[in-house]
């Protein structure tokens, strides 16, 4: 019985270690996140909001040498499922639709295996282009040739469906998993610079967190003294799955240690009995 417990505990620990070694397709280590909030009275239209965010990105890059990028959806949380439809009249498939700014893939450490990621001009104009995940490209066009093909996302709700514009595939993004047990996702990335009161941004920098946070606050206040920039947080701390997995690993390691001790006692007892 003790031996069975020992073997079972060892197998469980090995499974957890394997999961922790899963390649997520992006690098959360050293990546910081924060949120900007702007006062509506200072911004008469979406173009004014967009202007602030573009100036913020440009100023932070000039002051700190760090790239700031925006995303409509956070890491470690699977995005809402949309219907992703190809232009060949074929049936669409379920996948995620994420709006991101220029530099998103480089900052997150996501490989663009073919083509390129978005330019600043494309993100500002919300150009009709897209970066398609490898899994989505493979599912929509099994024979290959996703670059240059058209695709669109359709948001489906109880009230009906809302199709987005047709977009031309300009890049193929590497596989990304939002969690350690996630399947390879079929995601569609679209260019966009925030044009509203709120924006979640991400930054990777060589500067210590407190220094970087102070610099971001200063830049934001120089552009708009009413702008509110939340304190930075490390993206890897947002991973609730990893936190739970670490706890599970320690718990299983404890069980395995107990099982080892019991197994040794059992073997000692059997050996002592045989000698007598």
Language-model features, listed with the residues they occupy:
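Short, strongly hydrophobic transmembrane alpha-helices
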Residues: 1-15, 263-266
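Hydrophobic transmembrane alpha-helices
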Residues: 3, 34, 254-267
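Structured, solvent-exposed hinge/loop segments at the ends of secondary-structure elements
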Residues: 10-135, 155-160, 164-165, 218, ...
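Residue-level recognition of specific faces of alpha-helices
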Residues: 15, 247-250, 254, 267
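"Rare, low-scoring activations can occur
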Residues: 55-68, 134-135, 158-249
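Surface-exposed connector loops and short turns at secondary-structure junctions
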Residues: 137-145
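A glycine-biased structural micro-motif
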Residues: 147-151
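Intracellular coupling helices
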Residues: 265-276
């Amino acid at each position: 019985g003790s031996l069975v417990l020992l073997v079972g505990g060892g197998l469980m620990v090995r499974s957890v270690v394997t999961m922790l070694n899963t390649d997520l397709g992006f690098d959360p280590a050293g990546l910081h996140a924060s949120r900007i909030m702007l006062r509506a009275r200072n911004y008469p239209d979406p173009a004014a909001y967009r202007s602030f965010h573009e100036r913020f990105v440009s100023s932070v890059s000039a002051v700190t040498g760090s790239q700031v990028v925006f995303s409509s959806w956070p890491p470690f949380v699977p995005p809402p499922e949309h219907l992703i439809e190809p232009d060949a009249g074929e049936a669409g498939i379920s996948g995620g639709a994420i709006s991101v700014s220029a530099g998103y893939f480089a900052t997150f450490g996501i490989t663009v295996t073919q083509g390129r990621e978005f330019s600043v001009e494309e993100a500002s104009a919300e150009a009709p282009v897209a970066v398609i995940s490898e899994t989505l490209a493979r599912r929509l066009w099994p024979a290959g040739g996703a670059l240059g093909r058209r695709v669109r996302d359709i948001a489906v709700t109880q009230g009906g469906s809302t199709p987005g514009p047709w977009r031309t595939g300009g890049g193929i993004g590497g596989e990304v998993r939002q969690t350690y047990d996630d399947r390879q996702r079929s995601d569609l990335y679209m260019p966009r610079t925030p044009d509203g009161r709120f924006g979640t941004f991400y930054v990777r920098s060589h500067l210590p967190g407190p220094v970087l946070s102070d610099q971001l606050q200063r830049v934001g206040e120089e552009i708009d003294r009413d702008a509110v920039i939340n304190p930075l947080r490390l993206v890897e701390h947002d991973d609730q799955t990893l936190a739970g997995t670490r706890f599970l690993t320690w718990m299983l390691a404890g069980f395995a240690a107990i099982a080892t001790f019991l197994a040794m006692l059992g073997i000692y007892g059997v050996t002592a009995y045989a000698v007598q």
